[in-house]
């Protein structure tokens, strides 16, 4: 394998993921500013924040498959070109409908995640795949970049101009990918239906999808709802709320490669069991207390476990589905994206009925317990095979 080419493509694709996730997550940190200029109800805010997740999740399956057909270069390039339109529309938005429309197509920025997790492993040996995919996953930091920088920029130049500045970033990365992307990337051309048929018979796909639904779903969901949640429930300043949300995202992002390394060196399923036990404890803390200190501790526990869990899961995926990597990565990552769609809506719904968000966080703990049971089952089956 060409290590030099692998490192260069890993670097380019990771930075491209940063740009994509910056665009995907731009609405959430700017919502406290947008809601001052546009008349939006709390229910509409929840929908607007959740909408980018829909396309960002569903497109991950075809994007993963297309990467194996045409290569990461062209999927990234055309994604950046198409993203220019919703960014432009968002900068002009003056109604909830326009915010929803532009937000929907911003989902393309999240869908490109499955491009790299399909492409990157082709350049590395099996004992380095966990680390390589973990490093690529650091591109999720694009969400934190928007959380940190967008509110500060909006305070200085206005939220509309902040959005428009992203047009420059996306254009730069389209050009970089056009000239530096690998046109000779190895292709895998197994018919899609044949891949789906084989995958549908493998229970491990359903297990990994459930686990990633929780870990990446928590990463996305907390990144979406925390800025507004902190402002509304703890009366925290808008910029401070963005910084706190950015810390959650950054911590989870930088721990993703740690999860990959742990998966390379130890039993990834057993590591996930420990990871989920701690995540469940964090969710229970959030469900039982409204104090800002305990809320922070619970959020940090979930951030740490989500980051490490994400890395562990995408160490397992290439080893379980080597022939159907593109489609499998797309399906698993799609479920992770969808995991970020529902929680903000559930939190808003539960809070409107009970006056508290505690029950919503308890649901996270319940899902964690269900996932834990499946991990124990898989671990027992793999032990039996080794014996």
Swiss-Prot record:
Could you tell me where this protein is found in the cell? Answer: Cell membrane
Q: How does it sit in the membrane?
A: Multi-pass membrane protein
> Which terms does the UniProt entry file under GO BP?
nitrate assimilation
Q: Pfam families annotated for this entry?
A: MFS_1
Keyword NADP among UniProt keywords: no
> Which keywords fit this entry according to its UniProt record?
Cell membrane, Membrane, Nitrate assimilation, Transmembrane, Transmembrane helix, Transport
Tell me the CDD domains matching this sequence. MFS_NRT2_like (cd17341)
What conditions trigger expression of this protein? Positively regulated by the two-component system NreB/NreC.
**A GO term from the CC aspect:** plasma membrane
Provide the GO MF annotations for this entry. Answer: nitrate transmembrane transporter activity
Keyword Electron transport in record: no
Q: Where are the transmembrane segments?
A: 14-34, 45-65, 69-89, 97-117, 137-157, 161-181, 211-231, 246-266, 268-288, 294-314, 330-350, 358-378
Taxonomically, the superkingdom here is Bacteria
Give the protein family.
Answer: Belongs to the major facilitator superfamily. Nitrate/nitrite porter (TC 2.A.1.8) family.
State the function annotated in the UniProt record: Probably required for nitrate uptake under anoxic conditions. Also possibly involved in excretion of nitrite produced by the dissimilatory reduction of nitrate.
Spell out the protein name for this chain.
Probable nitrate transporter NarT
Q: Which organism is it from?
A: Staphylococcus epidermidis (strain ATCC 35984 / DSM 28319 / BCRC 17069 / CCUG 31568 / BM 3577 / RP62A)
- The gene for this chain is narT
């Amino acid at each position: 394998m060409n290590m030099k080419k692998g490192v260069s493509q890993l670097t380019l694709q990771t930075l491209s993921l940063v740009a994509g996730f910056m665009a995907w997550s731009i609405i959430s940190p700017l919502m406290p500013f947008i809601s001052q200029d546009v008349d939006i109800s709390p229910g509409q805010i929840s929908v607007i924040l959740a909408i980018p997740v829909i396309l960002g999740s569903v497109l991950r399956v075809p994007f993963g498959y297309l990467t194996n057909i045409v290569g990461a270069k062209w999927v990234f390039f055309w994604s950046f070109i198409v993203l220019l339109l919703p960014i432009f529309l968002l900068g002009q938005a003056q109604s909830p409908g326009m915010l929803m429309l532009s937000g929907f197509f911003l989902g393309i920025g999240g869908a490109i995640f499955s491009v790299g997790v399909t492409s990157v492993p082709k350049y590395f040996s099996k004992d380095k795949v966990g680390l390589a995919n973990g490093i690529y996953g650091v591109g999720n930091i694009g969400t934190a970049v928007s959380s940190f920088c967008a509110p500060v920029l909006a305070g200085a130049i206005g939220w509309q101009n902040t959005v428009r500045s992203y047009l420059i970033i996306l254009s730069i990365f389209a050009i970089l990918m056009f000239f530096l992307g690998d046109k000779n990337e190895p292709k895998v051309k197994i018919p899609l239906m044949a891949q789906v048929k084989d995958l549908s018979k493998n229970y491990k796909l359903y297990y990994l999808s459930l686990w990633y639904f929780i870990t990446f779903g928590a990463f996305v969901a907390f990144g979406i709802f925390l800025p507004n949640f902190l402002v509304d429930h703890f009366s925290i300043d808008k910029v401070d709320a963005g910084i706190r949300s950015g810390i959650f995202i950054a911590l989870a992002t930088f721990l993703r490669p740690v999860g990959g390394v742990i998966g390379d060196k130890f039993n990834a399923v057993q590591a996930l069991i420990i990871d989920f036990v701690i995540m469940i404890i964090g969710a229970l803390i959030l469900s039982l207390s409204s104090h800002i200190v305990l809320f922070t501790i619970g959020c940090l526990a979930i951030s740490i476990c989500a980051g490490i869990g994400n890395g562990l899961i995408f160490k397992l995926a290439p080893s379980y589905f080597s022939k159907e990597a593109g489609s499998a990565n797309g399906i698993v990552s799609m479920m992770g994206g969808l995991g970020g769609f529902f929680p903000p809506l559930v939190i808003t719904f539960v809070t409107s009925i009970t006056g508290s968000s505690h029950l919503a966080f308890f649901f996270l703990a319940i899902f964690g317990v269900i996932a834990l049971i499946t991990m124990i089952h898989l671990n027992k089956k793999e032990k039996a095979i080794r014996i």
